[in-house]
Every structure is written in C-alpha cells, then in structure tokens.
C-alpha cells in the first residue's frame, strides 16, 4: 500500500493555503454527499475526501503528512505503513512510522512496570438528520499490537456496536473506555475515542446550534406576502412571508435547529429573490405598469454594502 496523495484527492496543490483547501473540501463533500450524488462510488469518495480534510485542515498533521510524503519511498517506511492498510490517518500510528524512519526510539522500550495502553481515535461521519435522535452504529477499527521497541507488529480487527447520542456536534469526542490498545504488564487498556464529523448538507448550513437555509421567492411573493413550504430536518412546514420582504432578510423558525441537552437552536430562512425568465410581451407590459406606478421609487437613493 502507498501513502494516499491527499492533495490529489482534494484537487489542490501542496502549496495551497487552508482557505483554498477548505473551498475544495466543501465543493467535493457536496458533490459526493450520498443524499445528492448518483455516482456508484459516491460514499467511498465522500469518506476519502473527509479523510483528506481531517489531515490537511490540521496544521500539525499536515506538516507530519508532508514529511511522511517526502519519505514515502523509504523501504522501512513502506514496511510500517503497510500494517495500517485501510485505516484513516491517525497521528499516533504515524508516530511509530516516524520512529522507524528517523531512528528515534519508540514510546514503549524495555520498561517492565505496568503501562497504560494507547488511545485510539477514529472519525465517525454523521448526517444532520441523524443528530435528532440517538442511534446505533457499527464501528470497525483495528487495534495495533506493539513490540518491545514500540513499533507496530500487527493489528487486530475489532467491531463494536455503539450508541451515538442525540445532539452530537461537529468535533465532539465520545469516549469508549478500555476499547483502545491493551495495557502492558497488567496496565489498563487505552480508550477508543469517536470523533464526530457532521457531514455537509446539500440544503442546510450550521451556525452553532442554528441552521440556515436559502429560501427562493418570486418578486410578487416577497412584495405581497405568501405562505410557502420550507424544508426542515424533520418535515416541511408552511412559513408565512410578510409583505414587503427583502432579499437577504432572515426569517426565524423557532426550535427547528439542532438540539443539545441544554438548548435547541432555530432555523433561519434567508430570502433570495428569483426573477422569472425573460418576459414575453404581455408580461413585459405588466412590469412596465408596475414601473410607472412606482416611478418615484429609487432603489439607489442610498448606497451601501450588500
């Protein structure tokens, strides 16, 4: 197995800044989101993009990855890295690879006293809809077994059925005690940490506990008011649009955001005025009548930023 080229996966250059990489991540995550993409390998591509983002978005991990990439053809590196086949990036795993490449001693030398096992950290992708209720998830991962020099000797596959609580947030860490690597000489096992990654949604943006959704309106709906159907995470609801609504105006839908133990956020519908196609002769005449009736209105009377 070769070290994955995360820059190629994201379609960026190693010299690109974080802003460029983030833009690429959001674009690809939306493109391969299983709820949107019809491509047969969408889910695999989505997970691959998420794995690349997990590394390249962290300054320290990115620096370690860049250094590993420079040494990817080192025979000793390849022997160590092959033992991690099929696993996502894990900083602790790569510590052992660094040790073997750069001649450093591993963490576990010939100590005979009881030592606690390593913690293991894996990322769990969660869709927004799944945050509404507690749900079961089957987690598969590998537990590394270290030799006396602190290098990974082999890995033992492990599967757990775990509960993902309602209201989890992006970056939240869930501890599963004792599910990490075994302790040494009677020491306690390490822990397994599940790091929650909220997958980008094709409709909703997350702002703390609140959600935002773009609400397209026809000009007459904004001008005259209307009742329109708006999606939420659970169902569609009817929202009353007040007369004279403006583009960019935020309409609050209370209690339809993300829920946590202490607080439930709101959903904000952000108005976007959508013009109809090029008008025919009859429609153009109606627009002209409106223009004549509102001849004193000057939208550029006061200038300002959008």
From Swiss-Prot:
Q: Which UniProt keywords apply?
A: Chaperone, Cytoplasm, DNA-binding
What InterPro entries does the record point to? DNA-bd_curved-DNA, DnaJ_C, DnaJ_domain, DnaJ_domain_CS, HSP40/DnaJ_pept-bd, J_dom_sf
A single GO cellular-component term on record: cytoplasm
Chief location: cytoplasm
This entry's Gene Ontology molecular function terms read: bent DNA binding; unfolded protein binding
Gene3D superfamilies, per database record? DnaJ domain, Single helix bin, Urease metallochaperone UreE, N-terminal domain
The answer to whether keyword NAD applies is: no
User: Could you confirm whether the keyword Transmembrane helix appears in this record?
Assistant: no
Domain J, chain residue ranges per copy: 5-69
Q: A single GO BP annotation from the record?
A: chaperone cofactor-dependent protein refolding
Q: Which NCBIfam families match?
A: PRK10266.1 (NF007618)
Q: Which PANTHER family match?
A: DNAJ HOMOLOG 1, MITOCHONDRIAL-RELATED (PTHR43096:SF52)
Task: Quote the function comment for this protein.
Answer: DNA-binding protein that preferentially recognizes a curved DNA sequence. It is probably a functional analog of DnaJ; displays overlapping activities with DnaJ, but functions under different conditions, probably acting as a molecular chaperone in an adaptive response to environmental stresses other than heat shock. Lacks autonomous chaperone activity; binds native substrates and targets them for recognition by DnaK. Its activity is inhibited by the binding of CbpM.
Protein name, UniProt field: Curved DNA-binding protein
Q: From what organism does this protein derive?
A: Salmonella typhimurium (strain LT2 / SGSC1412 / ATCC 700720)
